[in-house]
Amino acid sequence: MTKTMLRALRGETLPTPPIWLMRQAGRYLPEYRATRAEAGDFLSLCYNPELAAEVTLQPIRRYGFDAAILFADILLLPQALGADLWFETGEGPRMSTITDMAGVEALKGKDEIHEKLAPVYETCRILARELPKETTFIGFAGMPWTVATYMIAGRGSKDQAAAHKLKDTDRPAFEALMDRITEATIEYLSKQVEAGCEVVKLFDSWAGSLKGQDFEDFAVAPAKKIIAELKARHPGLPIIAFPREAGEGYIGFAEKTGADCVAIDNSVSPEWAAENVQKGKSCVQGNLDPKYMITGGDELVQATKRVVEAFRNGPHIFNLGHGITPEADPENVTLLIETIRGK
């Protein structure tokens, strides 16, 4: 019996879609909050293989999801490249900034990242041993544009203005940074696969702010390069791409990049995504609005059924359109799973 998640990624249409949730290991779970407190802070948790493996396993024990995703953060890679990274309470991540070619050239090379990231690979090895045999293990990284937005601005921002400014005013420095991140991402994900990940997911959280040719050059092209290299090194490796809020850019994204599955956010309707992206044959992942994990009740049941129904004629992995939030009720996740699996 092949894992349901892998079957969907190979293009099978299943009677019940496999399910996992972005940020399924997170602050909505009391056991996660306890383990994070034990670690001391978020980054300490990411770099502690035993505790990072534990929080990855917690939602699998509680809910029996079809997949587990490595507990880490997309900003561990820029930290390994030499950027300073810290988290401010209530404010999120902060980083040192890169604003010119000198800053890019000061970064470490792609082969120098592994010492800092060694604990992440150890987490992968632990999970490859300890996950239930029916659970698919997903590794991940941020995509170059999204990672670059943090490295340029030093923080998350609503409009990614600093990254757009560098792109438009110092294209050589911007492209050099994108190339550095792209090369390092390939090495990072390759090591995750060697350490036991069965699938990798590429998170381009800010892809939606790239328009027209910029989307092709800085969302599509890096994804294509990363996917081609990973598949050359690891034949048969399934890859999920998530160009969040791409809108019309979702159409043809899998074909252009070589991704096996495109994750869809909830800014588009499941019916639109089924007609334009899935088309009865391409694997899609998504796309329930995370708000229903807070509100629950019949609204959650009906919205869940709508997503399942929209995608039932092609390969589908059920997920949210974005990460589950700290305000979510763990009981609503149980209701979600029961609705999908017909319990």
Curated annotation (Swiss-Prot):
CDD domains: URO-D (cd00717). Pathway: Porphyrin-containing compound metabolism; protoporphyrin-IX biosynthesis; coproporphyrinogen-III from 5-aminolevulinate: step 4/4. SUPFAM superfamilies: UROD/MetE-like (SSF51726). It comes from the Bacteria. Substrate binds at residues 23-27, 73, 150, 205, 322. GO terms for biological process: protoporphyrinogen IX biosynthetic process from glutamate. Signal peptide: none annotated. Keywords: Cytoplasm, Decarboxylase, Lyase, Porphyrin biosynthesis. The record marks 73 as: Transition state stabilizer. Its main location: cytoplasm. The keyword Cytoplasm applies. One of its GO terms (cellular component) is cytosol. GO terms for molecular function: uroporphyrinogen decarboxylase activity. InterPro entries: UROD/MetE-like_sf, Uroporphyrinogen_deCO2ase_HemE, Uroporphyrinogen_deCOase. It is found in: Cytoplasm. Its EC number is 4.1.1.37. Gene3D superfamilies: 3.20.20.210. It catalyses: uroporphyrinogen III + 4 H(+) = coproporphyrinogen III + 4 CO2. The keyword Coiled coil does not apply. NCBIfam families: hemE (TIGR01464). Homodimer. Belongs to the uroporphyrinogen decarboxylase family. Catalyzes the decarboxylation of four acetate groups of uroporphyrinogen-III to yield coproporphyrinogen-III. This is Uroporphyrinogen decarboxylase. It comes from Cereibacter sphaeroides (strain ATCC 17025 / ATH 2.4.3). The gene is hemE.
